[in-house]
Structures are given as C-alpha cells and as structure tokens.
C-alpha cells in the first residue's frame, strides 16, 4: 500500500482534524480544545488524541484537569513522527493543534510529504483583526496545495465573535466577508463560492476555564452540587468556603449557558461537516 498517496482511504484510521493558521494569536488552541475536543469526545465516546505542535507556546498545558483528551507535545524537530502518530492511533479521533507563523508552514510541508490519508479535515481560525482575514485566506491557499477536496474539507472558525447572530458577525468579520457598501479586496468570496464557517462566541467563562485547568464543556457537565456545599459550609460557620462554592456555582451556570447557546450550535454545524466513524 502506498501511504504517500493522499487519495487512499485507510480503513480503521479515524478523523484527523488539523487546526492551523499562518498567524499567531487567533485562538487556535481555544478552537481546538474548547470546541473540537468536546465535540469529538461527545460523538466518539472516547478520549481524543490531542497533538500540539508549537516550539514557543504549549497552550494545552493549561488544561491540567481535562479528562477528554490525551495530550502529546511535538516540536518541529520531530515532525517526521507526525504521520506515524496519526496513522498508528486508530482507536481515537485526532486533533493536531498547529502553532502559527513558521511552525504552520513546516507542518503543512510535512503533511504534504506524507499525504493526508484521505481523512483529514482542516479548521482555519481567525479573529476580526484587519489582517486576520487575509492571513486565513493565505493559509487556505497553502492547504489547497495539499487537500484534494478543499471545498468540502476546509472550514473557518470565526473566533471571539461578539454575537452568534449571522448579520452581526458578518459585519464584525468584515475582514473576511467584505461588505457591499465598503471597499474591500481579497475577501473569501473572491476565492470560494460557498465557504464553510462557524462563529465561536467570546465569553469570560473560556478564560475562567483555563485557570481551572478544564474545558467549558467539562465544567458544564460537572455534577458537583456547589449550592449544597455552600449551604453546608454556611451551617458550620465557614463563610469563606460558602462564598467560594457560590463562586464555582456561578461559573458552572455560565458554562452550561455557553454550551447551550454556543457550543451546541457549533456542534450542529460540525455534524453536517464531519463524518464520525465508530
């Protein structure tokens, strides 16, 4: 079997989702860990293999208490191991979180060498900064040199969206969509007729979850009854502990709201895009 042929569909190889951008600071790890990891865990029913490739920042280390991923760090000096990690892990879904700038180019070059095995999906995150749209399109062009079916297998994540309302985020991400009444060039419609994308709403609960070492999705499904713990602490006169439990209860409630109003909507979009193989 010729493993270098990207058209070959390998039986037993699960989905590999590569989250990549040529620009740093666009929230790749937020999309990978807060959105894609819980989605795959929920659908597949097993821990997700999470490969982070970044010589400068290992954001996944913040998630010290997560129980939905098996984390693996890979430096750019070990990129020749990437294909083996993906190919040999036939029992899990795989997320590859690719660092920005030079790291992104090196990883894409490596994947181009070994082929995509026919099961790779690509997510390109971007913020609403002036250059983010152009950088996302530049990343898409690089992926198109590897991906045989880019129209189906590339999706954009509109990160730190202020609202999930389509009209609102279309204007917030004018750097990506453009606007009929405003001068704009090199926007996505110049290159793709029907691009796939989903907004990821910004919320302070995302920041809080990182400090707690977990994902928002896991926080929402934490079965701890913090209200009961607060009452018990108050009854024994431990007022500070009661306040602490009330604080965690608020975060838990905010996490549940985020799952219901943001993540579940994204999961529906991903359902139409990703075929989950059991």
What label would you give each PLM region?
Residues 91-108:
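Switch II (G3) loop of P-loop NTPases
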Residues 56-71, 174:
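P-loop NTPase switch/communication element
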Residues 41-59:
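Short beta-strand-centered segment that lines the nucleotide-binding/catalytic pocket of NTP-utilizing
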Residues 99-103, 119-137:
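Conserved Switch II/interswitch segment of TRAFAC-class P-loop GTPases
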Residues 51-52, 95-97, 122-128, 156-160:
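Conserved beta-strand segments of the P-loop GTPase G domain that flank and frequently precede/overlap
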Residues 3-39:
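Walker A (P-loop) phosphate-binding motif
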Residues 2-4, 153-155, 160-278:
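C-terminal lobe/tail of nucleotide-utilizing enzymes
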Residues 112-116, 130-163:
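Conserved C-terminal guanine-recognition region of P-loop GTPase G domains, centered on the G4
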């Amino acid at each position: 079997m010729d493993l270098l042929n990207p058209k070959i569909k390998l039986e037993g190889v699960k989905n590999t989702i590569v989250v990549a951008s040529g620009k740093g600071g666009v929230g790749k790890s937020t999309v990978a860990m807060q959105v894609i990891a819980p989605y795959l865990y929920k659908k597949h029913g097993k821990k997700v293999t999470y490969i982070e490739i970044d010589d400068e920042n290992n954001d996944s280390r913040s998630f010290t208490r997560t129980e939905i991923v098996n984390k693996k760090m890979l430096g750019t000096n070990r990129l020749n191991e990437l294909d083996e990690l993906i190919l040999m892990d036939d029992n899990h879904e795989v997320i590859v979180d690719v660092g920005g700038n030079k790291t992104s180019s090196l990883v894409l070059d490596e994947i181009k060498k070994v082929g995509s095995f026919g099961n790779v999906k690509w997510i390109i995150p971007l913020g609403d900064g002036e250059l983010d749209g152009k950088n996302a399109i530049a990343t898409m062009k690089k992926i198109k040199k590897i991906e045989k079916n880019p129209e189906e297998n590339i999706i954009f994540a509109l990160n730190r969206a202020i609202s999930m309302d389509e009209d609102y985020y279309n204007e917030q991400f004018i750097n990506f969509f453009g606007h009929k009444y405003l001068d704009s060039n090199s926007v996505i419609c110049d290159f793709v007729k029907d691009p796939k994308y989903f907004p990821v709403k910004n919320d302070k609960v995302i920041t809080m979850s990182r400090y707690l070492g977990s994902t928002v999705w896991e926080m929402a499904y934490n079965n701890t009854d913090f209200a009961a713990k607060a009452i018990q602490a108050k009854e024994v006169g431990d007022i500070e502990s009661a306040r602490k439990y009330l604080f965690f209860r608020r975060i838990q409630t905010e996490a549940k709201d985020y799952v219901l109003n943001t993540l579940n909507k994204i999961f529906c979009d991903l359902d139409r895009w990703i075929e989950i193989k059991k």
